[in-house]
């Protein structure tokens, strides 16, 4: 897993070492941010169900001003902290351990220019 574009292009990110967390693929992130283009620059972003933090880190790499990561799994929160520190982005983000609905109840939606959600999905 790596950062696809922007100032951190090519930077490797740490991946989960446990089952159940499926990071957003590099290809999907590349497609998403190619569509968004320059609209990411100078924005405040919510990365909900943040998992590894890869989506929010990609936004920061491409010029987002600030990202709020929301994740309820404590292992994933630790992984986000590790990835953010590895990318030297701690001053440009906030990391909250909470379920997304609870976190949204405490943060005005107007606080964000862009909301990115990649919730977990069931597997059979």
Describe each PLM feature range.
Residues 1-124:
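Class I S-adenosyl-L-methionine-dependent methyltransferase catalytic core
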């Amino acid at each position: 897993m790596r950062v696809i574009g922007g100032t951190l292009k090519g930077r490797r990110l740490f991946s989960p070492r446990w089952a159940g967390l499926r990071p957003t693929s590099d290809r999907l992130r590349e497609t998403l941010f190619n569509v968004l283009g320059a609209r990411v620059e100078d924005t405040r972003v919510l990365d909900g169900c943040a998992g590894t933090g890869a989506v929010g880190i990609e936004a920061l790499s491409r010029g987002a001003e600030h990202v709020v990561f929301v994740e309820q799994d404590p292992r994933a929160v630790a992984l986000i902290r590790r990835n953010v520190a590895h990318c030297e982005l701690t001053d440009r983000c906030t990391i909250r351990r909470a379920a997304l609905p609870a976190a949204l109840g405490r943060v005005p939606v107007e606080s964000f220019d862009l909301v990115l959600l990649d919730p977990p999905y069931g597997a059979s």
